[in-house]
Amino acid sequence: MKFQQILSQKTMHVQKISRFFMFSMYEKYKKFIPKTKNIQIIGTNGKGSTGRFLALLLLEQGCKVGHYTSPHIFEFNERFWLNGKIASNELLEKAHEELESVFLDDVKKLSYFEYATFLAFFVFKDCDYVILEAGVGGEYDATSVFEIDFSVFTKIGFDHQDLLGKNLEEIARTKLKAMSAKALINHKQEVKVLNLAQKIANLKQASLNISSLD
């Protein structure tokens, strides 16, 4: 089944966050998923521009880079930026065939975003670095089941309150709990967000740096 057909059977609207399904799928198939160095971008504002900046910076250093972002504006392909170019239909179809050969009928069980996230690793299988933009939240986001080498937190504010929490602390907590062993957070945060970030870093024994750049 072609990737366009798979997408036509799924909805882009996130109705709820499954806390365990994506993780169970990853555990089931992780030995078949291409291994890369992963940088995760989490926050409310500025994820796309921050991710693209990092991707271009790494590309200029001679690295092979994939940038996975969402949502797309015109075409699904926009979610997959590989070494300076948007992925072609041919590349996505090849990646889909590889994904389907591993997941078999489980491909149909994945949500739109879960499918796209797994697909990204087959699109970017030859990359040195993959930059993953979290979709909704952080702790239970589909991108968080993978091994993350570095976390970047952009400005955290109110978003997806029906899914993430009713107040800023709840929203920030679910995002910040995705923190990897090495992390960077934008300094333009509410004081309570920065305090919570440091608390979580201490609990995780993570190395957290606060960026002074605008």
Place the predicted regions along the sequence by residue.
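Acidic, Mg2+-coordinating active-site environments of NTP-dependent enzymes
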Residues: Y129, E133, I148-D214
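Class I S-adenosyl-L-methionine
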Residues: S8, L59, E100, Q198, ...
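Aromatic/hydrophobic pocket-lining residues that form π-stacking "cages" and hydrophobic walls in ligand
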Residues: L54, A120, A197
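Short functional linear segments
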Residues: M1-G43, T50-R52, L56-C63, Y68, ...
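Hydrophobic/aromatic ligand-binding patch that stacks against planar heteroaromatic rings
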Residues: L57, V123, S144, K177, ...
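ATP-dependent carboxylate-amine ligase catalytic core
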Residues: F23-E27, F32-K35, E60-F146, D162-L164, ...
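Glycine- and other small-residue-rich loops at beta-strand/loop junctions that grip anionic moieties
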Residues: G43, F113, I185-K188
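Short active-site-proximal "capping" loops at secondary-structure junctions
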Residues: N45-K47, H72-I73
